Design a protein with these regions (language model features):
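Alpha-helical substrate-binding/gating segment
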Residues: 26, 55-64, 71-105
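Glycine-rich "substrate-gating" loop/helix at the edge of Rossmann-like oxidoreductase active sites
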Residues: 8-14, 41-48, 68-78, 89
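Alpha-helical membrane-targeting segments
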Residues: 53-75, 117-146
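Non-catalytic, hydrophobic alpha-helical segments
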Residues: 81, 85, 100, 111, ...
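Catalytic helix-loop patch of NAD(P)-dependent Rossmann-fold dehydrogenases
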Residues: 1-37
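Glycine/proline-rich active-site loop of Rossmann-fold NAD(P)-dependent oxidoreductases
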Residues: 18-19, 31-33, 44-53, 88-98
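Mid/C-terminal beta-alpha module of Rossmann-like enzyme folds, strongest
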Residues: 91-138, 171-176
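C-terminal amphipathic/interface module of NAD(P)-dependent oxidoreductases
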Residues: 141-176
Length: 176
């Protein structure tokens, strides 16, 4: 299923935090204040974020996907995230929940394959789910979850992504 802003945010720990946060934010909306709730995908950038943690493994020829690799991975390039925040500030008609993720979600195996291609390295060593959970505890489930999320409301309001696909985003991050 494709998750848009009007869908339920889920039932895991992070979903619970998001629901509570959004409920509190809506109190301001009830008083006439414009509220734009930002739901972030995984941010891709050179100086931090998911790729900064993955690139060293790929450079050492031990890169691969997480878990089965079939999970959908909602992501956004840092430049697009910043542009989307500016877009919301400049467009007073935009409010409510907004998915801050690229319009073309990728599966983890596609992310790993593309990162390997861009770096000129193989992508053959997946990190098993049990190792991710062991290393990251409950937060590991966040990386193993599958969310095919799209930024439906940003797109309907006319926002344009500089990096709409995973390959262009990874190429930009590696070139930074």
């Amino acid at each position: 299923d494709i998750l848009k802003e009007d869908e339920n945010v889920g039932h895991d720990f992070l979903a619970g935090v998001s629901k509570d946060w959004e409920k509190e934010a809506q109190q301001a909306a009830a008083k006439g204040v414009r509220v734009a709730v930002m739901r972030f995908g995984v941010v891709l950038g050179k100086n931090g974020g998911a790729l900064a943690k993955m690139i060293p493994a790929f450079k050492m020829f031990v890169g691969g996907s997480m878990g089965s690799g079939n999970q959908w991975f909602p992501w956004i390039h840092l430049d697009d995230l910043m542009a989307a925040v500016r877009f919301i500030i400049d467009h007073q008609d935009v409010s409510g929940p907004l998915n801050f993720c690229a319009p073309n979600p990728a599966r983890y195996r596609q992310l790993a394959k593309t990162l390997g291609e861009v770096l000129g390295r193989p992508s053959f060593m997946p990190a098993p789910a049990f190792m991710i959970r062991l290393a990251m505890g409950e937060f590991g489930d966040v990386f193993l979850a599958s969310q095919r999320t799209i930024p439906d409301r940003l797109l309907k309001h006319g926002f344009s992504f500089q990096y709409p696909d995973i390959k262009s985003a990874i190429q930009a991050v590696v070139a930074e």
